């Protein structure tokens, strides 16, 4: 399974609670914090929900 690096680039202030909970589920919470996760369909859906708050990079 492919791995992906997800980095939070924008704050969750003034975001709906659902997006804040999604950021927390992705193990993020601070600007410029990064995590490396397996790119499963579940993670892909979470990233799609908060695409305006995060950036993604594929890891070989």
From Swiss-Prot:
* This protein's GO CC annotations: cytosolic large ribosomal subunit
Q: Which CDD domains match?
A: Ribosomal_L30
Q: Which GO terms describe its molecular function?
A: structural constituent of ribosome
Tell me which Pfam families the record gives. Answer: Ribosomal_L30
Q: Name one GO biological process term.
A: translation
InterPro entries listed in its UniProt record: Ribo_uL30_ferredoxin-like_sf (IPR036919), Ribosomal_uL30_bac-type (IPR005996), Ribosomal_uL30_ferredoxin-like (IPR016082)
Keywords (alphabetical) are: Ribonucleoprotein, Ribosomal protein
The family annotation for this protein states: Belongs to the universal ribosomal protein uL30 family.
Q: What is known about its subunit structure?
A: Part of the 50S ribosomal subunit.
Protein name in the entry: Large ribosomal subunit protein uL30
